[in-house]
């Protein structure tokens, strides 16, 4: 039936990663072609994402570690930038491995951001940060919450749309 056809087409379009040369991987919203070379650590060179050839059997692990390191730098800086801009005080920022959410704000002002967010464009990372920081003041998704988000990021709906259209590309790990 039509529903099965749509699901089949979706998974053909976005197959699971097997970490072969030429495969596409996303970082900061850009697609890079996977390659292997005699390098010590992950390198971006033009449109190539190069992993150490000597560790090819550990490619998934190596790439996830690299994404974590990038997220610790990029995502944490974006959260801090928007916290300062919004006058939001948080207790800590942590990376999460949640399968179904991009972020959360705990009762004790702990901001949790999915490490996969670093695969998204910066404007999407910004939206995730603003969304979670807004929860420090508003613990729900009330009209006031969304007004707060929109005050900081008037085009936040574009980021939501990007996430809706591209989540599969960044959730293959």
Describe the residue ranges of each PLM region.
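Active-site-proximal or metal-binding-adjacent scaffold patches in catalytic folds
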Residues: 1-127, 136-173
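Walker B catalytic acidic pair
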Residues: 132
